[in-house]
Amino acid sequence: MTQISTPARRQVERFLDFSDHVGGLEEADVLALLRDHDITTLEQLVAKAVRAPRSAEPVPADPARTLARPKAATALATARITHPAPAMAVVVDGVEHDPADLTRFDGRPLTYLYHPERLTAVTDDTAVNGALWAAALLRDPRPATRGEVQMFEHVEYAGDWFWCPARQAYNDLTDVHHGPLHLHDWNDVISSMGGTNCTVRYYEHINFGGSSLIVPPFSDIPNLVPSGWNDRISSVWNHG
């Protein structure tokens, strides 16, 4: 048997165990996908896996940044922004709107507050940002016991998944890969997420730009389709 270091062996075993994240796989489907990527030999498969890009790690989230959008996000906010019609009631600035009527806000980012039966949104999130900032300062500095939020590729918590720890953020999900060969990234892929004891904010653009969805603690969301946020998330901020 070939002798390799324990750390190297663990990394190889993690690569070989990737299918645990995606459920049952058919051999023919796997081989067909590999051929699509010009992988027909064991050597080519290993070379591809070794050269695969590494995912970006989440970075510590500074509560003070909650008070103002980063410059990159401000620039993105001036780009074309559209609001998909959710399949639930929506209230904007205290006024209930027909979901299809959200087009009147196209070109302007909205901040949504998630509820399983309705969405509440504001055009000016200054007060919301202040509340999040204050909550972060008053929170116990010890690590949260269930702080990680788990996000899934498909509805009903299916497919691949990844995590974002408490008080951490991913500013660009195009840099966070999934699958053993890292053929895909997590940008505009999230379709459901598990509950955590943290407040989590999801943004439609990278660098925390565009509209955002604030999900309160202990909120399981098995399906993002009704809210209009399915396959729409490009950055994540776990406020802890």
Language-model region placement:
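Compact beta-sheet-dominated domain cores in extracellular/mature segments
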Residues: 2-240
